[in-house]
């Protein structure tokens, strides 16, 4: 047979699916010379397996629901009849080339034999479709043997030899290529173990494929088969069945995976490919996907995916966010964003449900509500009903880790704190999920530097009272950045701004531990999950609290010495001061002014120190964060710190600060040496374009003028 000449990247969506007559399934030599290795690329623990098991449902007609008879040009029962004698023995009710459970072969041999059988069956289906001039996918798919670590229920990892379905192409298999995951056990007793191993594959597929709506896995244990369907609400299983006694059902599953469009396999059909470029549509406006900027690695839950997209009509960049939300709360995030954008930089341009080709919304309940054949599915009541929404947001902003200098890192966090204060004071809302991904840097058209902003208000907490607090819940926070009190007692604690302040502190600590310089320079050979900060990532609230609350100043400083990259040695003072202010609350809780004072004074000290150590010349000194002069360098006109309207440089330390904090706020007697950042790359982003939201911002600025004056008066009274 001649190979197909059509080749596209595994992650792409092939063009030209309608006219594929004459395409011959490639005669690919199989098995390949080596087993494809798939290492783990995301952190997994036994909780993901227990959560998946807890959210598991049994749907009697799952295979028929996923691959309905009407979707096949040649039905599975016709295929089975055509396979008589050559591939399936109707007399003995047995697939002729299927590896028997009685064979005493090792796992790798069994995987090769099973993959060979599946490829032969797939090739037979393709040839029958071709000979009858029926439509076929644009790129052939093949089954390849893979080896990968798999997580078990007890938290241990085992090396597993299985099979992956992917589009035919290079042999460098990756998780992002996988269309279906197959786990194999030698006898029927191992079916539960095979299903258990499929969870690892599902988690990696969701974490590496931004266009995934659901994922399918196949468990083969001896002659027993079970189909597993994974989505953001959990897992759905088909009943177990014998591949020999139910040949049509087995053929339906294999044909659905290999001859139908990839939408049947869980890929989003609303994302289209034209000339190698991806497009999607929101509110009847088409956008081109320029890059994927975020994929939520947690398999269960909201499954947030964010893209940087460009609108052809105004040539502006936007962020488009895909998110699964509770059906009963589907409008809440959009309504909250409309409220928050009165004072925040984040703007909501469009918000709508993502619809299936039949006009119905994408939901996680559809597959769980099948009543075909009179058998009701077994679905636990606690499984959430999720719907898929798509939002268009602006401005597009860079991650905090793209800071160009340590001074800019502090400035961006200070900007985010100022915005946090506005939202809290004016709108009585707390962010509730401060982390290193939700603080962003955008090019401000007014200031001569990038400015920090907050994104993702999905976990926001509405507050009231004095001081204004709200009810915390299990959805608040991202584990490594969550305040100790919230980790230990999420349902009892009254969530206040000081909990978000603690998250700001952890953002700074984690960046100092995982980066080794500006411009998102990753720290080589360092695994934070194996470092002294491991309790942050293990959700160990007790150990985390011991370090933050109980360790002496000297012991905590030693903890930072063991954890921080040397590049950030001169930021340890900032972290220690913030820890004293936020964690050691004596007579009152810290305020926004208290926390911002720490940041502002350290920024001012660094600027003053740079002014003293920079040799004089005919040109203004260069600093990061100043206005671009057109040749890739940055210029500062005046080294004197500019007084902030929300934090007067001439003001003393706010009342209520600890003695240590007051001493920190005073001008330094012996400034620490300035860090040399001349050998690091300065991150530059294109100037921000004027977009549809520019006029909205001008209107909201007028509305918030009075609120800003009120806050300034409060600070004067406090000081």
Feature-to-residue mapping (PLM):
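Activation segment/activation loop of eukaryotic-type protein kinase catalytic domains
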Residues: 442-477
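Short C-lobe core helix of eukaryotic-like protein kinase catalytic domains
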Residues: 414-425
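Eukaryotic intrinsically disordered, low-complexity regulatory regions enriched in Ser/Thr and Pro
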Residues: 1-398, 406-411, 427, 442, ...
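Long, cytosolic, alpha-helical-rich C-terminal regions that act as interaction/scaffolding modules
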Residues: 520-636
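Activation loop
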Residues: 483, 494-506
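Short conserved helix-turn element in protein kinase catalytic domains
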Residues: 506-516
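Catalytic-loop of the protein kinase fold
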Residues: 424-444
